[in-house]
Amino acid sequence: MIHKTAIIDTKAKIFSSAEIGPYSIIGPNVEIGDHSVIQSHVIITGHTSIGKNNKIYSFASIGS
């Protein structure tokens, strides 16, 4: 599930079972794996791959 306030670049690959929280930003060339949870206010950019079954906590910033 992708929260309605999340911003997802069209070039990002998000598996259907992943969850993206409110106000998170997912940039191009980012991959979010199966059953991963991205909490609120997270920023993920660059050539970044988050594997399956991961949890990224609120206000984290990952990538370039």
List the predicted regions and their residue ranges:
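Acidic/polar low-complexity surface segments
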Residues: 63-64
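A structural motif detector for beta-strand N-caps
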Residues: 6, 12, 17-20, 24, ...
